[in-house]
């Protein structure tokens, strides 16, 4: 949960003037804990089962094929401004099934992120939070790296 909390706080606090690097985020742990426990957000998973370790991609892809319409409906109900996909199969599903391809923008050099133009929804590829990557790597080299690039892209588009 700590990785989720850091990421949630970073995504909501980062802007063109404040990049909220990992070292800054961890200084505010009590604030982050309160924020995480009181702010609305969703962690959408597919085929989540207790116990066990890893779910094979083949099984996950089959589950997405069988029940993807329910996941799409859940995301439509939530109408998020950001979707963080924990793993390749979920990201592939999101960018290929949620929105028409012609409405998605890829920022050059950032295949791990898409912008849905009509809703402004950002879709990110992320490591799964249970990945053995350190909290710092999970935070700085994943979603936050691409989000900062998106903010730069936004600034360029406004000029």
Please provide the spans of the model-predicted regions.
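A polyanion-binding, active-site-adjacent surface
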Residues: 1-78, 82, 88-93, 131-132
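C-terminal capping/extension of enzyme domains
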Residues: 57-72, 92-159
